């Protein structure tokens, strides 16, 4: 089934993937395309709508991202956001100027003229601004449909050409009626049918996997995390016993996790293999402290283990991975800069002894993966399991990985997760874990001086893992956690709580 498509044209802004997420939440499929490739892709795929994203540049800067004007003649509805609005305004004869002061944060937008894209919206509503340039004179043929106290041209519309633009960011939660505006664009202007659902995706992926694999064998790296678990369930539904799930116990798992994974997946519907590779991994990681190098080593050793298991199993043509959309984005695909190498993307060795990779989840955001898991009738405790990176505790141990650090971290992390669950806030926090730093500090226990590790606690709330806010855990929960860790875990004498959002920080420390 060919879905209706919206193309999100990427000009390099920080919220570009979030826009895609918002569109999909409204049951319309979309793809993100770099601006340099936009015209060719749009001509080829014939989307029902186009969205221009924000970006860090000024439209008048030399080498700033531009768009072929032919796109405006294709009779496809367009919505510009932030930089996208400035670009549309410039190309249609409006005036864009540098603001005296950057406008960043919440402001009140007032409707000045009615428009189809504002249907059902309040006369005044809170919007989120983040710009240094602004449109001082509207382009020819456009009406000003919203204003703010500091931005007289906050939104514009050309109803005849079906081109609309807003200076603010409707995709972020801070813009109170942003979802309504995007929905109006999709359904009132682009006439979307809303045919993007997990039920449809599941049916299509099963057929696609069967067509790709045929009667050949697939080897899946199963970590027990949400992504690989849903991937396993999907592949099992599609190809049954032609799937072998290999769980590599690399010695970098959380407390009791290896046994829990085996209990969950060792059944008659899957070929399940557990490999105890702890010594193999720790020997490779000995003396290594650079986080990128650790990720690469862990990623490569995973593949080597899979190759060894494949030889035991027999002819294996495909390696399957639970790669999801944020993994691809963070690993610097397209025009994005590399933030960190993801174990499912950047950590792959150049030579892999498999015919091909299968990544059936690579177009899905985390929340879509969970919805797919529920569609597959997976138990909720698996679908809502705490996210856990492929490199495991290897990237939650700062500096060199040692057995002592791993054991300390396992116990401390278990206590933190236990206290969060006891407080009944585990469903309110999207990810929470402990990190053992490479710093030792002076402390006092009883009458004795100590010189032990500092432990960090990290907890975030997020809807898509592309952006995240630090979780406001009650002080009493943090206090209970701290007291238990200090009393029950050796070699920890100081505990800190990470109050950094993403961006600027990533969720993991390494």
UniProtKB/Swiss-Prot annotation:
Top EC class, one word: ligase
Binding residues annotated for ATP, in chain numbering: 223-229
Domain Glutamine amidotransferase type-1, chain residue ranges per copy: 5-195
Pathway assigned in UniProt: Purine metabolism; GMP biosynthesis; GMP from XMP (L-Gln route): step 1/1
Ranges of residues in domain GMPS ATP-PPase: 196-385
GO-annotated molecular function: ATP binding; GMP synthase activity
Coiled-coil residue spans: none
Alphabetical list of PROSITE patterns matching this protein: GATASE_TYPE_1 (PS51273), GMPS_ATP_PPASE (PS51553)
Quaternary structure annotation from Swiss-Prot or TrEMBL: Homodimer.
Protein name as it appears in the record: GMP synthase [glutamine-hydrolyzing]
Species in which this protein is naturally found: Finegoldia magna (strain ATCC 29328 / DSM 20472 / WAL 2508) (Peptostreptococcus magnus)
